[in-house]
């Protein structure tokens, strides 16, 4: 779990958010979401490598969404949100037609929360 905490903290730094006191809760929530979608019982030790980055993205998305809904991002400079993010050999480019930085932030937040859900189908187990 410590490795996942470090990954979440590093990704939050991309959004210029340094403190996250409830990382464990949001990591557990993200893992539960993945388990519900895939009908699996993964733990932090048993989660496949292909799902680890999805777990981190979902946890970061949940933290940012929580802070936004609670008004903790009132003073956040949304203009600093990037139009594209590159992770490894994958580049995620967000809409060029977005009018405001807040809309761009919403698109990025949505991508963190559910943008990779189609990849979860590979790990889905059918229940009989």
Sequence positions of predicted segments:
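Conserved short "hinge" loops at termini or chain/domain junctions
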Residues: 1-54, 104-128
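Short loop/turn elements at secondary-structure junctions
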Residues: 61-128
């Amino acid at each position: 779990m410590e490795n996942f905490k470090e990954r979440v903290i590093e990704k939050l730094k991309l959004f210029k958010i340094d403190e996250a006191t409830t990382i464990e809760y949001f990591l557990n929530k993200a893992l539960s979401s993945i388990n519900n979608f895939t009908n699996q019982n993964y733990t932090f030790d048993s989660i496949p490598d292909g799902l680890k980055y999805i777990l981190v993205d979902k946890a970061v998305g949940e933290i940012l969404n929580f802070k936004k809904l609670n008004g903790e991002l009132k003073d956040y400079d949304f203009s600093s949100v990037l139009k594209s993010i590159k992770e490894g050999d994958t580049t995620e480019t967000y809409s060029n037609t977005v009018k405001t930085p807040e809309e761009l932030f919403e698109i990025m937040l949505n991508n963190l929360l559910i943008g990779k859900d189609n990849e979860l189908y590979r790990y889905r187990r059918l229940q009989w």
